[in-house]
Each structure stands twice: as C-alpha cells, then as structure tokens.
From Swiss-Prot:
Membrane topology listed for this record: Multi-pass membrane protein
Record-given protein name: Large-conductance mechanosensitive channel
Chain ranges passing through the membrane: 16-36, 86-106
Gene3D superfamilies in UniProt: Large-conductance mechanosensitive channel, MscL, domain 1 (1.10.1200.120)
Subunit structure: Homopentamer.
UniProt record similarity statement: Belongs to the MscL family.
Keyword Methyltransferase appears in the UniProt entry: no
Keyword RNA-binding: no
Length: 141
C-alpha cells in the first residue's frame, strides 16, 4: 500500500503534471505544424519549385534490375542503393518551421511576463537627504 501512496505523491507533484500537460500540448502542436507545413507552406514551395512531394526525390546509386519501376519504393524493395534526400528536405522544413514558431511563442511570452519590474520611484525624503549631502560636500571642499 505504501508503494501506491508514494506513486500518488510522485504523480501529483507539480512538475510531473506540468510535464504531462506539456507533452500533450506538444503532440497536438506538432500536428498543427505538420498541417501548416503540408497544407499551406509546401504548396507555395511547390508553386515556386514545381514539385509538391519531396519525399520521392532520390539519386539512384546503382543500376536497377530489369523491369523494376524507377520509383523510390520499388527501388528500395528491389535492394537498389538510393540516396533518398527528399524526405530529409521535408523533415528539415518541418523542423525549421517548428523551431521558428516555438521561438516566436517564447519571445512573446517573455515579453508578456516581464521578470524585471520597473524601478520604484525614489522617495522624497531620500531625495532631500541626497540634496543635503551634496550641499555639505560642496561646503567642505
């Protein structure tokens, strides 16, 4: 029974719950970024480049057996070595967009939550004491 109580204490700590919420929101955010990339950005890139699906971009490194279609999936299935760089391009674009969006979010949050409060106004009595001090210094010199 003590094991269950210890687990309950562990699971209900603020850090664990915050982490769980972060993972869930992160997974959902990843889907949003995937949609942003695949549905909005990649079609614009395709309009410029002329190709929408980068996952099938590859360089064939050896001759294929006779009768094998020249597609990435078929060449891999036939055991032909290929340099498949297209999927990497797509994943790299996803990462860069995700990193940029996270940067913008963190930047916005840090601006909203200003950790340095503005300096307090100097009290009137302190200003008066400074004037007296400065006056005494000037008389002594």
């Amino acid at each position: 029974m003590a094991l269950m109580q210890d687990f309950k204490k562990f699971a209900m700590r603020g850090n664990v719950i915050d982490l769980a919420v972060g993972v869930i929101i992160g997974a959902a955010f990843g889907k949003i970024v995937d949609s942003l990339v695949n549905d909005l950005i990649m079609p614009l890139v395709a309009r410029i480049v002329g190709k929408l699906d980068f996952s099938n971009l590859f360089i064939q490194l050896a001759d294929a057996p006779a009768g094998v279609p020249q597609t990435l999936a078929d060449l891999k299935k036939a055991g032909v070595p290929v340099f498949a760089y297209g999927n990497f391009i797509t994943v790299a674009v996803n990462f860069l967009i995700l990193a940029f969006i996270v940067f913008l979010m963190v930047r916005a949050i840090t601006r909203v939550i200003d950790t340095n409060p503005p300096p307090a106004d100097t009290p009137e009595n302190t200003l008066l004491l400074r004037d007296i001090r400065d006056s005494l210094k000037s008389k002594n010199q």
